[in-house]
């Protein structure tokens, strides 16, 4: 007999759309890109991955992210991603 | 009504004022943000705005909801923001609000522009005259990365893998709140220990050597509440008239026997409740076993609960530093019960069955 433990779920990878604005857009030289990431990830880890992948290291400490058009207020929070989710990399705002 | 827009052409301020004016409103307030012509001595030629448009509109809508929640009197709210290239001295943002009275209108506009600068995803790039590089601006109010809400610094207590960890220590998963609570309990416990030591130190340091140890407790002046008054025709300036020690080590012997009192008070009640007792007992007993406590069944139930409570408090405030607590406790008992998760191959099982069959033909 073979027992399969259903509880040990391996992290599932999902494809998300990453959007870049302002200085991020200039540094990454793109406005949007598809990026494969684990479906559950700490916001700061996700940001680190993006920073490395898209060459944003010079401004990494000022970046925040918005998941499906809502700010992720605390980078220590875990976020749960689905295929096709929109993730915006947001440098310091300067509206007004 | 809420008027929210991101627009590519110049904002018509008169039109905006007309939009928010209302016969029922005695106040219209408007804020117009215009682009400055210079920055640190560099002449600004133009500004380029860009936005995360969907989210910007969402956030602007949120600002409107917040305004209405705070000032329910507001009639109309207008938030217009320019996108694309804006020549110097043109309006880049217009915020307006109307209300029956001026206070709500004025405050709402102030609040809205502060919120807009901190939360609405819009960016401005200043383009300067001459060879100066264009620059992305940053609002001081802008939302910034926050990382420190998790107050527990995990890096200060790295796990030393090489050390042999006591079997009594288990790894637990706990959230920040729980961890904080545990750390606080530990602090409290430490504090209590230090306090009790201090009391003893104080007592001893006040003792002169010729007083023998039996009287030590009585003569200690720790934790004294005294009334001092001058006596008539006294040679001494002051004389102690009365001293009361309500608490402190000197009073230990005068404390009522709580355990005894409790047993006396509850003895009758417990015995009348015999139907429920066996169930209570078995449940309490299993809790006690789990917590490594031993008790006799006929012991007073309140005392047993008290012991369990004490145990919980102890465990809650215990850190690895308190290993000696484990060592003297009887938590080592269930050692025998722990199973080894050995896996057997099909061959081993066959051999085992074969042997068993042989043993009992």
Curated annotation (Swiss-Prot), chain B:
Binding site for substrate: 101-102, 117, 124-126
Pathway participation: Cofactor biosynthesis; molybdopterin biosynthesis
One GO CC annotation: molybdopterin synthase complex
InterPro entries: MoaE_sf, MOCS2B_euk, Mopterin_biosynth_MoaE
Pfam families assigned to the protein according to its UniProt record, in alphabetical order: MoaE
A GO term, aspect molecular function: molybdopterin synthase activity
Role summary: Catalytic subunit of the molybdopterin synthase complex, a complex that catalyzes the conversion of precursor Z into molybdopterin. Acts by mediating the incorporation of 2 sulfur atoms from thiocarboxylated Mocs2A into precursor Z to generate a dithiolene group.
Name this polypeptide is given: Molybdopterin synthase catalytic subunit
Chain's gene name: Mocs2B
């Amino acid at each position: 007999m073979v027992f399969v433990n259903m509880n040990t779920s391996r992290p599932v990878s999902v494809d998300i759309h990453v959007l870049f604005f302002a200085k991020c857009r200039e540094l990454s030289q793109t406005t949007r890109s598809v990026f494969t990431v684990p479906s559950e990830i700490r916001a700061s880890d996700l940001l680190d991955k993006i920073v490395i992948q898209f060459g944003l290291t010079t401004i990494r400490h000022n970046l925040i992210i918005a998941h499906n058009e809502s700010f992720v207020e605390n980078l220590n929070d875990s976020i749960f991603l689905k295929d096709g989710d929109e993730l915006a990399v947001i440098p310091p705002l300067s509206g007004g | 009504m809420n008027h929210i827009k991101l627009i590519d052409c110049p904002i018509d301020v008169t039109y905006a004022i007309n939009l928010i004016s209302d016969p029922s409103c005695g106040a219209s307030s408007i804020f117009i943000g215009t682009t400055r012509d210079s920055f640190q001595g560099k002449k600004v030629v133009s500004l380029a705005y860009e936005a995360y448009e969907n989210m910007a509109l969402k956030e602007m809508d949120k600002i409107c909801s917040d305004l209405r929640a705070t000032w329910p009197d507001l009639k109309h709210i207008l938030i217009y923001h320019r996108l694309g290239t804006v020549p110097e001295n043109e309006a880049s943002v217009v915020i307006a609000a109307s209300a029956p009275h001026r206070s709500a209108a004025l405050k709402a506009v102030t609040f809205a522009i502060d919120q807009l600068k901190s939360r609405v995803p819009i960016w401005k790039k200043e383009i300067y005259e001459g060879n100066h590089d264009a620059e992305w601006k940053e609002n001081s109010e802008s939302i910034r990365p926050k990382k420190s809400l998790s107050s527990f610094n995990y890096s200060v207590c790295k796990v030393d893998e090489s050390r042999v960890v006591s079997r009594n220590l288990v790894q637990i998963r706990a959230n920040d709140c729980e961890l904080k609570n545990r750390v606080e309990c530990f602090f409290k416990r430490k504090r209590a220990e230090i306090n009790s030591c201090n009391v003893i130190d104080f007592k001893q340091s006040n003792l002169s050597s010729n007083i023998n140890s039996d009287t030590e407790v009585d003569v200690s002046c720790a934790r004294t509440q005294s009334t001092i008054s001058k006596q008539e025709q006294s040679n001494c300036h002051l004389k102690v008239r009365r001293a009361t020690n309500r608490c402190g080590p000197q009073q230990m012997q005068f404390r009522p026997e709580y355990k005894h009192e409790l047993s006396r008070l509850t003895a009758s009640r417990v015995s009348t409740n015999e139907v429920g007792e066996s169930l209570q007992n078995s449940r309490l007993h299993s809790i006690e076993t789990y917590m490594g406590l031993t008790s006799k069944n006929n012991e007073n139930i309140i005392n047993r609960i008290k012991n369990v409570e004490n145990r919980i408090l102890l465990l809650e405030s215990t850190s690895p530093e308190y290993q000696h607590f484990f060592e003297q406790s009887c938590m080592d008992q269930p050692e025998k019960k722990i199973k080894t998760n050995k896996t057997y191959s099909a061959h081993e099982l066959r051999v085992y069955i074969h042997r068993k069959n042989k043993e009992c033909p």
